[in-house]
Amino acid sequence: MSILSFLLGEKKKSASVAKERLQLIIAHERAGGHAPADYLPALQRELVAVISKYVKISHDDIRVSLERQDDLEVLEVKIEIPQA
């Protein structure tokens, strides 16, 4: 980070913010055992809001699921983007 970026408060990109949020969610879930994934609907709404800035999509165009098998967790996000 440069001094100017620090002083002027350069805004983070939405992708890096989303990545940080996902990392926090995953770390929280792993630390807390196998609690229910009650954050998935909120995550889906936020994804729709971010992607809608660039492409016209609806809430039904995104599917978010979390699968657990033993000590492995898979967060799956499926996004249907309409053809141009």
Curated annotation (Swiss-Prot):
Q: Which residues lie in coiled coils?
A: none
User: A biological process (GO) annotation for this entry?
Assistant: cell division
Has keyword Cell division?
yes
The record's annotation in InterPro entries points to: MinE, MinE_sf
Q: What function is annotated for this protein? A: Prevents the cell division inhibition by proteins MinC and MinD at internal division sites while permitting inhibition at polar sites. This ensures cell division at the proper site by restricting the formation of a division septum at the midpoint of the long axis of the cell.
Please report which protein family the annotation says this sequence is part of. Belongs to the MinE family.
Name of the protein in question:
Cell division topological specificity factor
The protein's organism comes out as Paraburkholderia phytofirmans (strain DSM 17436 / LMG 22146 / PsJN) (Burkholderia phytofirmans)
